[in-house]
Amino acid sequence: RLADEGLIETLARNEWARNRISIELLESIFLDDSDPVYDKHIGKLRELGVDIAIDDFGTGHASIIGLLKLNPYRLKIDRQLIAPIADSPSQRGLIKSIIDIGKSQKIQVCAEGVETREHLEVLRDFGCECLQGFYFDRPMAAHDLVDYIAKEKWRSNS
């Protein structure tokens, strides 16, 4: 879909989309084998105020050069890398390094798969800005989200 001119044209026609949309690209299909058409469209998306995020980081074979070239707004560390941090010092070191790389490039880093209090504490200690996972709650319907926020239920797990 990223190569689809219709996507760019539709977003350009809709003012509401500016600065409200984030497109997540899978690390495994984009970073190392980027196409000039993709590069052009990503530039146009940025001009329209669309944030670019890399999803499932750590599961593909991306290079640091690919990361620098794309310069995403957000880098989402895959849950497979987060799961073992409670028991593995080497895994914690790897996650800390990824977070530090993101920070050095002014990229927001988001950890997916936060499922325990220990995950939360380790990632907070590392300065991870965005945490996502079942520790906070399960997915829910939009109409349930309004009540959840109003009653501040989310505060009990943070």
Enumerate the language-model features and the residues they cover.
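Serine/threonine-rich low-complexity intrinsically disordered regions
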Residues: 4-6, 14, 35, 150
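EAL-family c-di-GMP phosphodiesterase catalytic domain
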Residues: 1, 20-33, 50-158
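Alpha-helical scaffolding segments of alpha/beta enzyme cores, especially the outer helices
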Residues: 6-9, 37-47, 96-100, 122
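Acidic (Asp/Glu)-rich catalytic clusters
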Residues: 6-20, 42, 68-71, 124
